């Protein structure tokens, strides 16, 4: 704490009173005779010049003490106060920097998290789109295969039917021609029918 003028005046007053009171107390240790006012003044101030010299000496000593002790001490205290204030300021600055760094880290973390979620959502959307496209292509390919198979089966059935009809006409023509050449018995007729049926079955195979 820095001393002001009031503190200095109080210290000087205490020292002055001590110079005055100490001789008085010393003189009062013995038997105290009855003193008149003049003797009391002479006892308190036996010699005015000695008192003045003591006051001057006290002021000189106090000035030396103030010069040799107080100023270096005050200077050291000022440096200490400046050092403490600097440490407090540095601590506050470090705290603010740490808070700012924490805020930046939080912002970067949130941004990275949002970007990650966006990438995941985009990947899911692209995967769903690709799956739907592949399913559509697969359905179209399957429909084409089924349609082609149906057409092929229908063509093959038509060709077989046409071939069977042609063979049946040919067989009927041959049978009619054979019947015209000779008269068949019941047994020969059954044989011709059985032979015609077997030929149809063989042709179907």
Swiss-Prot record:
Positions of S-diacylglycerol cysteine lipidation: 28
Lipidation (N-palmitoyl cysteine): 28
Cellular component, GO annotation: plasma membrane; proton-transporting ATP synthase complex
Compartments, as annotated in UniProt: Cell membrane
Transmembrane segments: 48-68
KW Zinc (keyword) present: no
Native species: Ureaplasma parvum serovar 3 (strain ATCC 700970)
Highest taxon of source: Bacteria
Protein's name in the database: ATP synthase subunit b
Keyword annotations: ATP synthesis, Cell membrane, CF(0), Hydrogen ion transport, Ion transport, Lipoprotein, Membrane, Palmitate, Signal, Transmembrane, Transmembrane helix, Transport
Signal peptide: 1-27
Entry membrane topology: Single-pass membrane protein
Pfam families attached to this UniProt entry: ATP-synt_B
PANTHER family: ATP SYNTHASE SUBUNIT B, ATP SYNTHASE SUBUNIT B', CHLOROPLASTIC
Family: Belongs to the ATPase B chain family.
Listed GO MF terms: proton-transporting ATP synthase activity, rotational mechanism; proton-transporting ATPase activity, rotational mechanism
Subunit structure: F-type ATPases have 2 components, F(1) - the catalytic core - and F(0) - the membrane proton channel. F(1) has five subunits: alpha(3), beta(3), gamma(1), delta(1), epsilon(1). F(0) has three main subunits: a(1), b(2) and c(10-14). The alpha and beta chains form an alternating ring which encloses part of the gamma chain. F(1) is attached to F(0) by a central stalk formed by the gamma and epsilon chains, while a peripheral stalk is formed by the delta and b chains.
UniProt function note: F(1)F(0) ATP synthase produces ATP from ADP in the presence of a proton or sodium gradient. F-type ATPases consist of two structural domains, F(1) containing the extramembraneous catalytic core and F(0) containing the membrane proton channel, linked together by a central stalk and a peripheral stalk. During catalysis, ATP synthesis in the catalytic domain of F(1) is coupled via a rotary mechanism of the central stalk subunits to proton translocation.
């Amino acid at each position: 704490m820095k001393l002001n003028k009031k503190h200095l005046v109080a210290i000087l007053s205490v020292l002055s009173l001590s110079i005055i009171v100490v001789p008085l107390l010393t003189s009062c240790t013995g038997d105290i005779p009855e003193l008149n006012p003049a003797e009391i003044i002479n006892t308190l101030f036996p010699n005015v010049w000695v008192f003045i010299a003591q006051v001057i000496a006290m002021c000189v000593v106090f000035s030396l003490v103030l010069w040799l002790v107080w100023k270096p001490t005050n200077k050291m205290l000022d440096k200490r106060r400046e050092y403490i204030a600097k440490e407090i300021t540095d601590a506050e600055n470090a705290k603010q920097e740490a808070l700012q760094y924490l805020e930046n880290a939080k912002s970067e973390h949130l941004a990275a998290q949002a970007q990650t979620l966006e990438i995941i959502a985009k990947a899911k959307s692209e995967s769903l789109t690709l799956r739907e496209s592949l399913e559509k292509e697969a359905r179209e390919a399957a429909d084409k295969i089924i349609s082609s198979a149906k057409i092929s089966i229908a063509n093959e059935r038509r060709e077989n039917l046409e071939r069977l009809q042609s063979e049946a006409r040919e067989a009927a023509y041959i049978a009619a021609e054979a019947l015209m050449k000779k008269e068949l018995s019941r047994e020969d007729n059954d044989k011709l029918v059985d032979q015609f049926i077997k030929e149809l079955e063989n042709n179907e195979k």
